[in-house]
């Protein structure tokens, strides 16, 4: 069984409040899905929720940064240890929800660490404000964090040969 395969499945009939799988439709709901193949398509038979991070949707900035984290994690997981990327993503999203740290500072930290882990940049002394463990990330001035994040996202797009949809 191949390990680097993406399978796409559609959830139908889950918008109804009484649907058994309506929780799987919520943004930032991480679920384990059991798929059933019907002809050339897959259907979701059951789902069990691993983690609900719906709190990311509490503000527009958190939602955008959370979406950026998801998209960059998905793109970088193809070339690195995907389990480590997933654990880092969950940690970052929880920090985004429960800490008072600026969302752009957390997004910058996450994207920067993905680039370092992928071997695309070397850490330097000038990066000391965001080259820290996610739990140690402190607030950076919002304008600075935003402009640095934008620069690192541009670099991310070049290094991973993708065009991000969320930022």
Where are these regions (language model features)?
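Non-catalytic alpha-helical scaffolds and adjoining flexible linkers that form interface surfaces
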Residues: 1-167
């Amino acid at each position: 069984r191949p390990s680097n395969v993406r399978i796409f499945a559609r959830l139908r009939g889950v918008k109804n409040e009484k649907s058994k799988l309506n929780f799987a439709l919520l943004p930032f709901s991480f679920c384990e899905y059991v798929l059933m193949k019907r002809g050339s398509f897959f259907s979701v038979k059951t789902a069990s929720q691993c983690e609900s991070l719906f709190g990311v949707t509490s503000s527009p900035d958190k939602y955008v940064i959370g979406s950026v984290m998801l998209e960059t994690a998905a793109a970088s997981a193809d070339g690195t240890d995907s389990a480590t990327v997933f654990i880092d993503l969950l940690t970052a999203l929880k920090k985004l929800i429960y800490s008072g740290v600026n969302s752009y500072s957390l997004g910058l930290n996450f994207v920067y660490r993905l680039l370092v882990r992928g071997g695309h940049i070397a850490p330097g002394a000038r990066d000391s404000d965001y080259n820290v463990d996610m739990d140690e990330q402190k607030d950076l001035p919002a304008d600075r964090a935003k402009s640095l994040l934008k620069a690192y996202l541009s670099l991310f797009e070049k290094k991973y040969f993708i065009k991000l949809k969320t930022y």
